[in-house]
């Protein structure tokens, strides 16, 4: 059956959408959709009117994509939210698109990526996505905690070199265990 790849480049208040089929067939050149119920419902109507299988791909950048992804999932469409790095690597290798970031090109890139990775596209679910984000936040938290300890030790060592014995002048207030 026909494959319709919908690339959505989400930004604040609006998205740019492009629809491709295999063999470079352009179903819809990049067009803009505002994030209001009327225009989003219009997009849903358009997507649902396509013959064949349809998959929607967007990147998780910023926080704007979440609203759009959840809206499109709620009406029963296949939505995949992918890591921007994957798309960037893919487009650098496979597409000879002139450099320069434009939303129009990005929506086409996303649709092309969707066609290329058609069978591996993960279905977006709010739960699994939340888990992914929590893992990332946890990783970041741990990195910053390590960095904080490193910087404190560095500061103590510098203080020690500049003013030997100065560390003994400071008392650390008793801390309650976390």
Please provide the spans of the model-predicted regions.
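Glycine-rich, often acidic, oxyanion-interacting loops/wings at catalytic, nucleic-acid
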Residues: 138-178
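Short, glycine/acidic-enriched loop or turn micro-motifs at the edges of active sites
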Residues: 12, 62, 86
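Gly/Thr-rich phosphate-binding beta-strand-loop-beta motif of the actin/hexokinase/Hsp70
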Residues: 2-21, 110
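Acidic, metal-coordinating catalytic cores used for nucleic-acid/nucleotide bond scission
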Residues: 57-67
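Short, basic/hydrophobic alpha-helical segments
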Residues: 38-55
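Short glycine-rich, Thr/Ser-proximal phosphate-binding strand/loop in the N-terminal lobe
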Residues: 13-38
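Short alpha-helix plus adjacent loop in nuclease-associated cores
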Residues: 73, 80-123
């Amino acid at each position: 059956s026909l494959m319709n790849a919908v690339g959505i480049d989400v930004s604040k208040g609006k998205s740019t959408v492009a629809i491709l089929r295999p063999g470079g067939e352009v179903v819809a050149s990049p067009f803009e959709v505002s994030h209001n119920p009327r225009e989003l419902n219009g997009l849903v109507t358009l997507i649902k009117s396509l013959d064949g299988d349809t998959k929607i791909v967007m990147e998780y950048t910023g926080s704007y994509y979440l609203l759009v992804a959840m809206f499109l999932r709620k009406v029963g469409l296949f939505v995949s939210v992918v890591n921007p790095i994957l798309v960037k690597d893919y487009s650098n290798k496979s597409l000879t698109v002139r450099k320069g970031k434009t939303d129009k090109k990005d929506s086409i890139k996303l649709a092309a990526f969707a066609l290329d990775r058609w069978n591996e596209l993960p279905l977006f679910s709010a739960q699994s996505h939340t888990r992914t984000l929590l893992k990332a936040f946890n990783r970041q938290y741990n990195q910053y905690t390590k960095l904080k300890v490193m910087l404190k030790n560095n500061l103590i060592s510098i203080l020690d070199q500049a003013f030997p014995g100065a560390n003994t002048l400071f008392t650390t207030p008793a801390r309650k265990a976390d």
